[in-house]
């Protein structure tokens, strides 16, 4: 069924190499790999959408996870102590408070704009979420991608931008200063990939 459905299309594009491999195995044809739609917009368009005023008035590090663990929260407390930054923890389920400490502040069930605002104005971002990682790159925020090389979407993005060193294993959150890659180089790579993707999309959709 999937093979017949895919073969009915004149052109196919996917976002990750792993997905391209899967489609090629089924159809015998290699699809075009295009960058994620979030990267097709200019950075300034995202900045205008988010706004320049932070919703958190003090310096902070942002931790986002659907299922944060007590071990991760303990590491965040140690990192907060080393850096002097308060931890802003946001999660989509919002049914718990793992640790009650003044240095951890919970922002539960934030909307899309608030989520992007938290990323844009953070001193440091820690997450396993693709969108947290991609917007950290867009806004040039230092970050770590938890288990990043095990996630198809995140690993493809990190490989594309040559930022694999930002991937960390769960429960091994590093110091923010232990890995500093050049965001300008990453953005230049993204610009080239964007131009290539736009050429394909314009051709395929005509």
Task: Map each language-model feature to its residues.
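Active-site anion-handling motifs in enzyme catalytic cores
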Residues: 1-206
């Amino acid at each position: 069924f999937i093979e017949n459905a895919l073969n009915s299309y004149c052109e196919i594009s996917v976002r990750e190499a792993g997905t391209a491999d899967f489609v090629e195995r089924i159809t015998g044809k290699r699809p075009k790999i295009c960058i994620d739609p979030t990267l097709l917009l200019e950075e300034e368009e995202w900045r205008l959408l988010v706004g320049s005023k932070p919703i958190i008035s003090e310096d902070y590090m942002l931790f986002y996870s659907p299922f944060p663990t007590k071990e991760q929260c303990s590491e965040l407390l140690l990192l907060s102590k080393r850096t002097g930054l308060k931890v802003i923890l946001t999660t989509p389920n919002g049914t718990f408070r793992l640790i009650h400490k003044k240095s951890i502040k919970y922002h539960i069930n934030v909307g899309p704009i608030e989520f992007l605002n938290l990323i844009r104005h953070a001193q440091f971002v820690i997450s396993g979420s693709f969108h947290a990682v991609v917007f950290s790159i867009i806004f040039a925020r230092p970050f770590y991608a938890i288990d990043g090389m095990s996630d198809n979407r995140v690993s493809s993005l990190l490989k594309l931008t040559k930022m694999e060193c930002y991937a960390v294993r769960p429960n091994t959150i590093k110091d923010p200063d232990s890995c500093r890659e050049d965001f300008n180089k990453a953005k230049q790579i993204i610009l080239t990939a964007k131009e290539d993707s736009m050429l394909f999309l314009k051709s395929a959709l005509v």
